[in-house]
Amino acid sequence: MEDGRPVWAPHPTEGFQMGNIVDIGPDSLTIEPLGQKGKTFLALINQVFPAEEDSKKDVEDNCSLMYLNEATLLHNIKVRYSKDRIYTYVANILIAVNPYFDIPKIYSSDSIKSYQGKSLGTMPPHVFAIADKAFRDMKVLKMSQSIIVSGESGAGKTENTKFVLRYLTESYGSGQDIDDRIVEANPLLEAFGNAKTVRNNNSSRFGKFVEIHFNEKSSVVGGFVSHYLLEKSRICVQGKEERNYHIFYRLCAGASEDIRERLHLSSPDNFRYLNRGCTRYFANKETDKQILQNRKTPEHLKAGSLKDPLLDDHGDFVRMCTAMKKIGLDDEEKLDLFRVVAGVLHLGNIDFEEAGSTSGGCNLKNKSTQSLEYCAELLGLDQDDLRVSLTTRVMLTTAGGTKGTVIKVPLKVEQANNARDALAKTVYSHLFDHVVNRVNQCFPFETSSYFIGVLDIAGFEYFEHNSFEQFCINYCNEKLQQFFNERILKEEQELYQKEGLGVNEVHYVDNQDCIDLIEAKLMGILDILDEENRLPQPSDQHFTSAVHQKHKDHFRLSIPRKSKLAVHRNIRDDEGFIVRHFAGAVCYETTQFVEKNNDALHMSLESLICESRDKFIRELFESSTNNNKDTKQKAGKLSFISVGNKFKTQLNLLLDKLRSTGASFIRCIKPNLKMTSHDFEGAQILSQLQCSGMVSVLDLMQGGFPSRASFHELYNMYKKYMPDKLARLDPRLFCKALFKALGLNEVDYKFGLTKVFFRPGKFAEFDQIMKSDPDHLAQLVKRVNHWLICSRWKKVQWCSLSVIKLKNKIKYRAEACIKMQKTIRMWLCKRRHKPRIDGLVKVGTLKKRLDKFNEVVSALKDGKAEMNKQVKDLEISIDALMAKIKSTMMTREQIQKEYDALVKSSEVLLSALQKKKQQEEEAERLRRIQEEMEKERKRREEDEQRRRKEEEERRMKLEMEAKRKQEEEERKKREDDEKRIQAEVEAQLARQREEESQQQAVLEQERRDRELALRIARSEAELIIDEAQADPAALRSLDFHPVTSKINGTRRTMTPEQMAKEMSEILSRGPAVQATKAAAGTKKHDLSKWKYAELRDTINTSCDIELLAACREEFHRRLKVYHAWKSKNKKRNTETEQRAPKSVTDYDFAPFLNNSPQQNPAAQLPARQQEIEMNRQQRFFRIPFIRPADQYKDPQNKKKGWWYAHFDGPWIARQMELHPDKPPILLVAGKDDMEMCELNLEETGLTRKRGAEILPRQFEEIWERCGGIQYLQSAIESRQARPTYATAMLQNLLK
C-alpha cells in the first residue's frame, strides 16, 4: 500500500508511531509498525496520517511540512525537542516546550541583540522573535499589542513572560532606572504570588497582565501590572506535596537573625499554615549549607532540599531584597511587608477549645496565648480585642430605635477557626494588593502612545480534588480559549470569506455554551452561587442542588457519578458537579464554594483591623474601607462581596482590552508530568496541542494568510514619496506594481478585495514592504516606477504582436470558412446524387468494354455486320441509360434493374461472340474479359456489404441514443418525483447535519474528557473506569447509527472507539459514496471482518453471484474510503491524483442522496441487485478531460486528453487515458485497482452524459492500438487480472 511509504498511526503513550499500511478494513487500516515484522494492529482510518519521507528532518515552522497534520506536528516538535530546540512556529504562533533545564546562551544578551529588528522566520524560532514582532507591529500599525502566554501549569508561562519583558526593556528601553525596575518587579511578585504545586514548582497562583508603555519615539516610558484572582485558600491549607507562597519559606530561610527575633520566626514546621504541606526548602548544595540547622524542619533534614534550577529560597530572599531596593522600597517598608507576613503565620497558630459553659462559645487554648501576643504585636492590634473578635461576633438589634442594642454572640470552635482563617486571608490579600500597587508606583508614566501587554495567568488546572479556585481559573481559560478561537479561527475565516480568498473552512469546537453555563445571568453557576450567598443560611449542598436542577439537561454539566475516575464516583450529587471544559471534564467539589465566594469579614474583625494602631496596617485596608462604605452591614449580618462576579468583571475588562489590541500567542507545552528534562510524553503533549487549538490552526494555515495589509495603508505610506504620475495610480494597482518590482513570487501572496495577504513563512517579505524607513520607501518607489515603465513597454509590444496575430487569424478563418463551405456543399451534393453517380460509374465501366467487343467483331470473318449491329444496339442502350440517369432522378433500385438488363444483354452478346470466335487468341481474350467481370461482381458485393454494415452501425447508434433518451426521461421522471418530497427531505437532512455536527462536538468532548482523565489518573495514580468495561450489556443494547445522535429522544453516550469509527464515516468521499452505503440495505453476507486481500481473492474465484456482488460492493466501498483518506492527506503543492476525470468523480449525485430509502424505496435499486441484473452487460464510454494543472490556463494552451472506460456490469474492468504529450496509460481491474475509478457506473453519471457512450468496436480499436491486448495478457499470465468479460474474451481468442 502507498508504495511502502510510512504512515503515522495512534499510540497510547507516544501519541503516534510509524508503520506501513498492509490492509484496508471497512473503517480502519491494518498497520505494521516499522521494525516489527509480522506484528500488526488496527487503526481507525481518520486517525492515520502520512509521514514525512525523512523522519529525522525538522523544520522551524510547522507550516513548512510536506504533510500538515497533528502527527507530523507532534513528531516535528519531538525531533526539535531532542535537539534542545524548544521553540517552533505554527505560522505566527509560537509553541514553547518547557525544557526543565537551562539551555546555554539561549537567553543571553547577544541572543537578544541578534533578534532585534529581524522578521519572523529569518532567525530560529524564539520567544524574543515574538516580542520583537509585537514591537514592530505596534510601531508600524500604530496600535497597541498583546502577547498571550498560555498553557498548563508547569508549562513555562511565567519564565517566557519574564523573557518577553526582559527583551522589550533591554532592546527598546530608555536607558533609565525604569527599565531595570520593570524586570526587577518579577522576583517580588513571584515571592508573594507563586507557590509549589504538584505540577509546578513555581506556579503563579494569580494572573497578571503586565503593560509596557511606549512614547511616540517607541521607547519604554513605564509599566503597569494588573492582577487577578489570588488563590487565598492556599494561605491556610495546602496539599501534602505542595507549599504555601514562597515568601513564607524565604523569610524563614533567608532572614537575618535580627529580623527573625523581631518577627518571632522559627522553622516552617512550627506554623499551622505551613506544616500541613511540604516544609522543605528549595536549595542547592551551597545554599543548603548557608541555611542554619534550627531553621530546617525534620522533613528537610530527612529528605534533603527540593531541587529546581530556577528556585533557591535562601538565594531568592537575597534577590528579593535587592529587587525591593531597586524598585524604591526602603528598609522600613520592607520590614513592614515582612511583619505582616509573620503576623499571618502567628495568626494561624491560634487555637480554640470549647468554653465548657452553657453559652456554647469557645476560648483560646493556653498554648495559643503566645501566638496571640505575637500576632497582635505584629499587626498593631490590642491583644484582648483580638481575642474577643476571634471568639465572638457583634450583632446590632434595630427594634428599640435607629441605633439599636449591641449584642455579642459567642462563636463555636469551628466558627472561630473560620473567622481566624478569613482574617489571615484578608490580611494577606490586602498585602498582595499593596505589593502590586507599590510595583506600579515604581515605574510611573505621564503619557503613553501605545503599550505591549503580556498576559500570564494560571493555566488550565485539573487535580484529583478541585475547588473554587480551580473553577475560576478554568473559567478564565475558557474565556481565553474563546478569544483565541475568535481571533485566530473565526475572525480569520470571516476575513478570508469577506475578501474572497477561497480558503477552505476549518471547523472547531465552540465553547460558548460552557461559558454561558458559568456566567449567564440568573442561570449561570456564578449567579446561582451569589444568590446562595445572599440567603440567611447559605449552604454548599443547596447551591449544588440548585446548579443540577437548573441545568439537568445541559451537555456541559454532569453529576460526579458519571466521572471516568473512580475517586469521583464516591462524591454525592449535592457535593459536586462535573463541567466539560474545552480541555476535558473536571469534577469540582463544592465544599467551601459559598465561603470562598465571599470576600468580606464580619463586622467585629473588620472594625478591629481597620482601627489598628499600626499605620501600615490601616493603609492596607483604607482603600477597601472606602469602597465598602455604601455596603454597610445591617442587623449583624455578614456583608457580601462576590469573588466570582468580581473576577468575571475583571476578566471581561481584560478581554475588552485584548480585543482592542493586536494579538500574538505563545502556547507553552508541558513535556511530561514528572517535570524532568529530555522526557517527551507524546500522548499528553498531543492532548495539549489539540486542546490549545494548534491542530485547527494547522488546518487553517494550510491555505491561510497570517500577514496582511490594506491597499490604502500601503498606498498612503508611500504616497508622499511618489511623483505625480505614480500618485494617480489606483492603490490596488500600485500594490501590484510594488510586489512585481520587488520580484515576489505570486504563490507567496494573494490579493483580496481591500487587502493583500501573505502566506505563512513570508514575514520577511511582509516586513520589507511595511518598513517605514524614508530612504527605504523612496527606493521602493523608484523600483515601482522602473517596473511600470518596463511593463508598459512590454504591453505595447504584446499589443502590436496581438494585433498582427489577430489579423492573420481573421484571414485564416475567412479562408477556412470558404473551404468549409465548399466541402460541405460538395458533401451535400454527393450525398444527394450518390446513387446516380455510382450508377454512372458502373454503366461507364460497361461502356468501356464495348471497345473490346468491337475488336472481337473486327476480327470475325463471318457475321461481322450482324455482330456490329448488336454491338451498336448495346452501345445505344448504354448511352440511353446514362442519359436517363443524368436527366432524371432515379432510385438506386431502378438504376440497378436497368444496369442488370444491360449486363445480361452484354453477356448474351459475349456468348454469341464466343461461339464465333474459334481461335485460341480470341478465346483467351474472352476468358480475360470473364475474369474482369467476375472481379467487378465481387467488388459490387463488397460495396453492398460495406453499405449494409454502415447502415447497421447507424441503426445501433440511433438505438443507443434512443436508449439514452429513454434513460434521461426516466431520470427526469424520478427527479420530478423527488421534487415533490424535496422540502421534507431537505429539512430532514438539515436536522441530520445539525445532529451530526452536535454529535461531533460531543464525540470530540468525550475524547478530551477521557484523555484528561487518563492524565489525572497517571499523575494521581488513580484508576480510570472504561464505560465499555463497566456495563458492556448496556452498550450492546444501544442501536448506533452513523447519522442520528439521539436514540428515542435521549442523547447516547459513546466510547472513544465508537466515536472514532463514526468520525471515519465522514471521510467517505461526498454524497455519492454515502448514497451507495445507504442503498446497500440489509446485507446477507457480513464482510466487515474480511481482509482486503480476501475480498479480492473471492472476486477472482467465486461462482456465487450474490457473494460476488457483495464482495465487489464492499471492495469498492473500501477503495472509496481509502482514496478519500489519500485525498485528504495529500502532499502540499501537488496536483490532485486523478483516477477519472473531474466530471466523473464530482458528478452531482444529490438527487439520489436526497431520496431516503424509507421515503421513496423504489427510487433506486440496491447496488447488489443492480449488479445481478446488469451482470453481463458490457458498456463502453469516452469523455474528454483537462489536467488539473491546465484548467486555469488560456483555452488555447490547454492540453485535452481522452478517458476511456469499459464497465463490466456496474464496475469498471478496463480504463485508458490518452494524453497529448505522453504515452497512453492502460489499467485493468485487479492489477491496477488503486489507480482506477472506484465508483460504480450509476455513481459516475456516465450513462446520463450525452455522447459519452461509444461502440465496443471504437473502444477495442484504441485499446489494441495502444497495446492493450499485450498488457491484459501479461496481467492474466501473472495472475493479477481479475476475471472479467475482457479477460474471458482474450483467453478464448488466444485458444
UniProtKB/Swiss-Prot annotation:
One protein family per Pfam: MYO6_lever
Subcellular location: Golgi apparatus, trans-Golgi network membrane; Golgi apparatus; Nucleus; Cytoplasm, Perinuclear region
Region annotation Three-helix bundle: where it falls in the sequence: 835-916
Modified residues annotated as Phosphoserine in this record: 267, 604, 1156
InterPro entries: Kinesin_motor_dom_sf, MYO6_lever, Myosin-VI_CBD, Myosin_head_motor_dom-like, Myosin_N, Myosin_S1_N, MYSc_Myo6, P-loop_NTPase
Post-translational modification: Phosphorylation in the motor domain, induced by EGF, results in translocation of MYO6 from the cell surface to membrane ruffles and affects F-actin dynamics. Phosphorylated in vitro by p21-activated kinase (PAK).
Domain of life of the native organism: Eukaryota
Keyword Nucleus: yes
Region (Required for binding calmodulin): 782-810
Phosphothreonine: modified positions: 405
Region of interest called SAH, as start-end residue ranges on this chain: 917-984
Region (Interaction with TOM1): 1158-1286
Residues of the Myosin N-terminal SH3-like domain: 2-53
One biological process term in Gene Ontology: inner ear morphogenesis
Region (Actin-binding): 651-673
Function field: Myosins are actin-based motor molecules with ATPase activity. Unconventional myosins serve in intracellular movements. Myosin 6 is a reverse-direction motor protein that moves towards the minus-end of actin filaments. Has slow rate of actin-activated ADP release due to weak ATP binding. Functions in a variety of intracellular processes such as vesicular membrane trafficking and cell migration. Required for the structural integrity of the Golgi apparatus via the p53-dependent pro-survival pathway.
Entry note about domains: Divided into three regions: a N-terminal motor (head) domain, followed by a neck domain consisting of a calmodulin-binding linker domain and a single IQ motif, and a C-terminal tail region with a three-helix bundle region, a SAH domain and a unique globular domain required for interaction with other proteins such as cargo-binding. The SAH (single alpha-helix) region is characterized by a high content of charged residues which are predicted to stabilize the alpha-helical structure by ionic bonds. Its contribution to the mechanism conferring the myosin movement on actin filaments is debated.
Protein name in the entry: Unconventional myosin-VI
